[in-house]
A protein has these predicted regions:
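Hydrophobic alpha-helical connector segments
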Residues: 69, 83-114, 170, 194
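Helix-turn-helix
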Residues: 23, 31-65, 69
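Amphipathic alpha-helical packing segments from all-alpha helical-bundle domains
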Residues: 76, 80, 128-154, 164-168, ...
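Short helix-capping/turn signature of helix-turn-helix
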Residues: 60, 121-126
Length: 211
């Protein structure tokens, strides 16, 4: 007699659901990242994932929930990279810490244009719930930048200013630049873009404000 919960291929229901979830997420990344959220349908995602609609609804209540899960995972990955970068550059001046953290945050987007589209374009205004999630994550990023800059002021490295304004300017500029880069072929090398983004971060956050 088969062990309870291990009816198929020696996997528990939880393990099978985890595999289905992963396939749904990979398919969602492909479809949303190339065709857009509005063009994404549950039947289309299920067909491409080889997951029945019944199993889909056992995992996600709807399309929005799939998108939220995908965006959460993308953003959590980026924030984990930021934390690792800030730990690795502890004790370094802001001129080293902030550019490294910005590039760490952007690494998944620079590796995969689909991720850039999801994180920087499709997420905007997709629904009230998704928009709130985007703004909450943006607020966290603004707070991280502000904390780093305030600490740098305390060390006498830079002059104080409105860090929320500067952080929002950086986030907005980076969002537009990276997505534009991902859209176009031919494009500059990733290395060239990283240099430009690091320089931009330094100008916005460390240059002395006008007298």
């Amino acid at each position: 007699m088969a062990q309870e919960g291990r009816s198929y291929g020696g996997l528990t229901r939880e393990e099978r659901d985890a595999q289905r979830r992963q396939r749904l997420l990979e398919t969602a990344k492909e479809i949303i990242g190339t065709q857009g959220y509005a063009a994404t349908t549950i039947p289309g995602v299920c067909a491409a994932s080889k997951v029945s609609t019944r199993h889909f609804y056992e995992i996600y209540p709807g399309k929005e929930d799939l998108f939220v899960d995908l965006y959460d995972r993308i953003t959590a990955d980026s924030y984990a990279r930021v934390a690792t970068s800030l730990t690795a550059t502890a004790g370094e001046p802001i001129s080293e810490r902030v550019p490294a953290a910005v590039l760490a945050y952007l690494d998944p987007m620079l590796k995969d244009p689909r991720v850039a589209r999801i994180a920087f374009v499709e997420i905007m205004g997709a629904s009230p719930r998704i928009e709130k999630l985007r703004l909450d994550y943006r607020e966290t990023l603004v707070e991280i930048v502000g904390t780093e800059c305030a600490a740098s002021v305390g060390r006498g490295e830079i002059l104080d200013r409105d860090w929320r304004f500067a952080a929002l300017a950086l986030v907005g500029a980076v969002t537009a630049i990276v997505y534009d880069w991902a859209l176009h072929q031919p494009r500059s090398s990733r290395e060239a873009l990283e240099t430009q983004l690091a320089d931009l971060a330094l100008v916005l956050l460390t240059a002395d404000p006008p007298a």
